[in-house]
Amino acid sequence: VQTCALPISNMLSVAERHKYILDHLNKYGFVRITDVANELGVTKVTIRKDVKILEAKGLLYKVHGSARSANPHVADTDVHVKGNVNREEKERIARKAVELLNDNDSIIMASGSTIYAFAEAIKREFRSHLNVVTTFLKTSVLLNDVEEINVVQLGGCVHKKSLSAIGGYAEAALSDFSCSKLFFGVDGIDLEHGITTSTIEEAKLTQVMMRSASKIIILADSSKFGQRGFGRICSLEEIDVIVTEIGRASCRER
C-alpha cells in the first residue's frame, strides 16, 4: 500500500490561510512570504495575494518579501525612550562593535541609543588611544572622562529628541576630518528602501559623515529590520558592516 502526504494547502481555504498568516504574525511579529508558501505548499504568488488582501483590511503591513504585524514606518522618538527598548540586545551589539576598533583609530560616532551603548562599552572595555568625532552630546560627556580618548564635539543646532548637533555647522565641520570608521544607528533597514532614519536632517548629516570615513558600520538591533524611517540615508550596498544580533551579536560584512 502506497501512502502520500498531501500539502496543507489542500485542506485550507482562503480564510484558513489568512488565519494561518495572522496567527504567525501575532506570535512572531514577522513572516516571510517564501516560508509561508513552503509551509502551506502553495506558490509565493498565492501568499502575496493573501498578504495584499490582509494589508487592504489593515490587518498587517507588507514589506519587501515579508509582512509585519506593526507599521514599518517609525516615528521620531526621544533617545531616552529608545534606550529602554531592547537594552540587553544593544549592549551585546555594543560589545561586539568594540572588537572592530584598533589602537589610534579615528572614528565618527553618530547619535542614538545603540551608539550610546557602544560608547559605554568603549569606556568599560577599550584600553587604547582613540580619537572620537561625534555630534552626540551624551557620548561627548561620557568619553571625555577617559584619559586615552580625544573627543571632538561638533557644533550646530541640538535636536531635542536625539540630543545630536545637526545642520549646516556640523555638516561643514565634518569635511575637515578623514576618519577610519563611522559607527551609526538607524531607524530602519529594508531591502527595498535601504537605510533610513526618522528625520531628514539626521539622514543628511549621516550622508556627510559617510563621506568622511573609510569604513561604514551600522549598529542595529533586530527590531530595525523591515522598518522604514522618513529620511533615507543610503542603500544597503553602501554599507560595509552591520553589527546586529541573530541569536547572538554578530558582524555581517559585505
Feature locations, PLM:
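Short, small-residue-biased leader/transition segments that mark boundaries at the very start
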Residues: 1-6, 253-254
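Conserved phosphate- and dinucleotide-binding cores of soluble alpha/beta proteins
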Residues: 10-25, 30-36, 41-43, 55-56, ...
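Amphipathic, non-transmembrane alpha-helical secondary structure
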Residues: 95-98, 102, 116, 120, ...
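Conserved SAM-binding loop
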Residues: 107-108, 132, 198
